[in-house]
């Protein structure tokens, strides 16, 4: 992202996890100013967005409580992404936030604490930030509920058993990363993609490496095709 999307795209430097990167002139010494009014801030979701929001809010002097449904920091989309063999470096992100937030006495993190319609009213806060991430888009295809149909996130996390040859519907970043994982497990892969080519939104150098790996593994690629 920082190189392929920003620098090669002749855009200002930005970082996926450090919002101050490229904006240092606005934040002397990398710190934000203190808030004039201290508030109680509740953050729902302990992914990168929620934890960064907690860090900034606490630096400004607010009292922060973070509620996470899973048993770990970054237990949602980042955990799924970091399970890919080409993105295992992302597994260090939760440790970074754990250290940073551990230095701030005005941050409390509640794991295994999903916020629901039933218990939301019990949260006492002046401000609530919803940082709950996203769910995968499941297309309305006949047979999509079949026992042999698995979600990419379940495959990457080892929650879904995969047998035999595999057809992957979608040749974007998630589809190709899942294909690379299944190749390492010894599966024969076919990727079906609606667009004229795979991972068109991926930055150039990463795309070249991933496409070479698919070619070396003999993956069957069907572009400009739809699953119906």
Region spans (language model):
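Cysteine-cluster motifs in flexible loop/terminal segments that predominantly coordinate metals
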Residues: 1-37
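Rossmann-like dinucleotide/flavin-binding elements
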Residues: 35-72, 109-124, 131-141, 145-148, ...
